Regions:
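Short, acidic, metal-binding catalytic loop of nucleotide-sugar glycosyltransferases
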Residues: 25-36
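Short beta-strand/loop segment that forms part of the nucleotide-sugar
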Residues: 35-48, 72-76
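A conserved acidic beta->alpha catalytic loop
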Residues: 41-56, 105-106
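Active-site nucleotide-sugar/metal-binding loop of Leloir-type enzymes
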Residues: 86-97
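Short beta-strand-to-loop acidic/aromatic patch adjacent to the donor-nucleotide binding site
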Residues: 95-106
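Conserved donor-nucleotide/metal-binding helix-loop-beta segment in metal-dependent transferases, i.e.
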Residues: 110-128
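Short beta-strand-to-loop element that shapes/binds the nucleotide-sugar donor at the catalytic cleft/hinge
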Residues: 124-141
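C-terminal catalytic/acceptor-binding lobe
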Residues: 162-254
């Protein structure tokens, strides 16, 4: 009998002890093989009481299901540096797949881990179904560890879902799978309108800011990532004809992302989802035409 594919769960958390327990519980109770899960927590050193809560309330639940969990302690970086948390966690992962997860996420689908495992060996960005009402992104991205091994990072911006989804759409390696979660977030469900939610700082929507998702340097960085991944895809026998056509001027890189965007989309990331190249924002902000997507 073959050894189950390990799935590494990347889970930064702050100030949400009970929510964290509920979120993890939903993952392990719905997994076909919970023992294949490797939960990697990113916790701030000043998150009072969390370490004790993990030992007293969460560890026994994990031991019962034989789920490995490792907590990585950080000096507080803030939401605007969320990518630094997940980049570090990814570097410590031993699984074949990296699965982004949130402490306000609730897994709804039994056997969700099997849906990921079906794609093992494929270099794709996978997406769960969600309650964002037609958002085109992979809100909690799922990707092979080889992505990190190749790039030495997952994202260079706190909007990790946007960063990875844009790259995947440009290469036509985005796939939504038959597994669903509930994002139990204040702007979506009315729940958990807490300090953690209120203190979020988005690096998106102001492309004049060098740290913004839409800044020209950030767009150039994503295109460099696309070119590197396209090279790798050819090496493994999975060439991206889509990207070749983009480079030849025959294909809109974001055609499928636009087609997957509902008019009623809810949640963060709407700026980039509905304006993937930042053109509208450039017109509004009157910044240089250099901010366009450069291929």
């Amino acid at each position: 009998m073959s050894t189950p594919t390990i799935l590494s769960i990347l889970l930064p958390t702050r100030g949400r002890r009970e929510m964290l327990k509920r979120s993890i519980e939903s993952l392990i109770n719905t997994a076909s093989t919970p023992g294949r899960l490797e939960i990697l927590l990113g916790i701030d050193e000043d998150d009072e009481g969390l370490t004790e809560y993990l030992k007293d309330e969460i560890a026994p639940m994990l031991l019962e299901k034989q789920v490995e969990c490792r907590a990585n302690l950080f000096k507080p970086l803030g939401y605007e540096n969320l990518h630094q948390y997940v980049n570090h966690l990814a570097g410590t992962a031993t699984g074949e797949w990296l699965v982004f997860w949130n402490d306000d996420g609730i897994m709804l689908t039994d056997g969700w881990d099997d849906e990921i495992d079906k794609r093992t060996g494929q270099f794709k960005l996978l997406a769960f179904k969600d309650n964002h009402n037609g958002h085109p992104y992979s809100i909690f991205p799922i990707l092979p560890k080889d992505w990190y091994n190749l790039m030495d990072h997952l994202s260079m911006n706190a909007q990790n879902d946007a960063w990875l989804s844009h790259i995947a759409y440009m290469l036509d390696i985005f796939e939504r799978i038959d597994a669903e979660f509930l994002h139990d977030r204040a702007d979506l469900t009315g729940n958990n309108d807490d300090e953690t939610f209120q203190n979020r700082k988005y690096q998106e929507g102001n492309p004049e800011d060098p740290n913004d998702f839409g800044h020209p340097d950030m767009q150039h960085a994503r295109v460099r990532s696309v070119n590197k991944i396209a090279w790798y895809l050819k090496k493994i026998g999975q060439p991206s004809e889509w990207w070749d056509n983009v480079l030849a001027g025959k294909q809109d890189p974001f055609e499928k992302m636009k087609a997957n965007t509902s008019a009623g989309v809810e949640g963060a990331g709407q700026f980039a989802a509905n304006d993937p190249t930042g053109k509208k924002s450039r017109e509004t902000k009157k910044i240089s035409d250099d901010a366009k997507l450069v291929l």
